[in-house]
Every structure is written in C-alpha cells, then in structure tokens.
C-alpha cells in the first residue's frame, strides 16, 4: 500500500457506532421483565401452578377492567388509589418537614446527634406491625393512626441519611463562606443543604420504599378504602386476581415515585 494512502487511512478512520452503557442497561431491564412475564404465562398456561394461587395474565386484565368499572366494596378503584396516595403523601410531607431539619441539626451539632441517635436507632429496627397495637391504643382507629404508622417508617431513614450527608460536607467550604461574612442560616441554605442533597434524596428514596411497604400494615387499622385494604379484604375471599392487581398497582405507583426521584437526583444533584 502506498505511504500516502496508508496515512489517509490512519488519519480518517471509519467511525464505528458504539452502543452506550445506558442502552445496554435498558435492554437488560426489558429482557428481565419479558423473561418474568413469559415464565408467568407459561406457568399458568401449562398448569405448573394452579390459577387459584397465581392467576393468568389475562385474568388480571379482566380483574383490572372489572375493578375500574365496578369498583370494590362500595368504592371505585380511583378512590382506593387516591386514599392510599393521600396517606403516603401526608406521611411523606410530615417526614420531610421534621426529619430533614433534625438531620441537619444532628449533622451540625454533635451533642444533638448524641442525644437523638439512640432514640432513632432504638425504634428503627422495630417492624411497624410490632408497635401498631400501641398506636391504635394511643391514637384510635382514625386516619391519624394510619398516617402516623407510615410516617414513623419514613422518618428514620430520611433522618439518618440527612445527618450523614451534612457530616460529609467539606468543612473548608463552610469556613470559606463564613470568612466572607455569611450568617449561619446562609451557610446552611447555600452550602450545607446543596452539598448534602444527594444523600438526602437517596434517603428519601429508601424511606419511600419502606413507606409503601408499610401501607398495607397501616390499612389494617379499621380501613374501608385503600389499596392495602383492598388486598387484605380480597385475600380473605381468596380473590387472588384482585390481590395481585392491588399488589401490582402499589408496585407501579412506588416505581413511579422512585423514577421521579431518580430524575430529580440526576437533574439537581448530579454531583453526588
């Protein structure tokens, strides 16, 4: 090959299309979901599992359509979904308003951290069902008990993540801002909170996962609406299709929250 032709080939290599890592991850996620769906279909189609224990996919679509049109136990499907959403959102709002400020305080003040940490670590490992009877005795069977149970599940993960994020803030940045005359509030607002935001959002994601798993326990308390109530009530009548539809709806809503928080984390806390 002539030298000038070889030089041209080296200087102008043929571009190759490379698949991005994100594309591979999406393909892997889609393949796993498809494989699970095929396994589910085969198990019900060929009789590997009795439909009483695992309804076929077409049965679930029929149950969802029936629930959408007729509702369940004197409430529409939207009312069940809306009631559960409202309970989780109220608990989430209360957790954000209390856990984040207390987490900042624990991260900035070692004395406050030493005082609050044993209390949080004492109740955090206790399953919500364990203190559910106490909540009913103390606060009755109204909405407060349901929201409070979910709130307690959300509070500890968010508090611990916030405190850890504040402790990891670079102290040289804090000192630099203070040397410029910033007040304590300005340091917290413009330095500490933005720096701790990735950990706070991660804690929020973990807390919401725990909160949604506590929803069913919360709706044990004399509820007549909600997805958790629907699942428990249908289980008593062996309406497995309604049980699975309720579980899948809870999972879908929780996944939507998770994906939304991931987007917020990428958009506003990419440095974490």
Task: Briefly describe each language-model feature range.
Residues 1-34, 259-272:
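Transmembrane alpha-helical segments of polytopic membrane transport and secretion proteins
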Residues 17-18, 46-93:
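Periplasmic/extracellular loop-to-transmembrane helix junction in inner-membrane transport proteins
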Residues 61, 74, 78, 82, ...:
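Alpha-helical membrane-protein architecture signal
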Residues 90-120:
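Transmembrane-helix boundary motif in ABC transporter permease subunits
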Residues 121-157, 164-165:
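Generic hydrophobic transmembrane alpha-helix motif, especially the helices
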Residues 137, 213-250, 269-272:
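Glycine-rich helix-loop "coupling/hinge" segments at transmembrane-helix boundaries
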Residues 148, 152, 184-218, 241-245, ...:
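Transmembrane alpha-helices
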Residues 161-206, 227, 231:
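Short cytoplasmic-facing helical segments at TM-TM junctions of multi-pass membrane proteins
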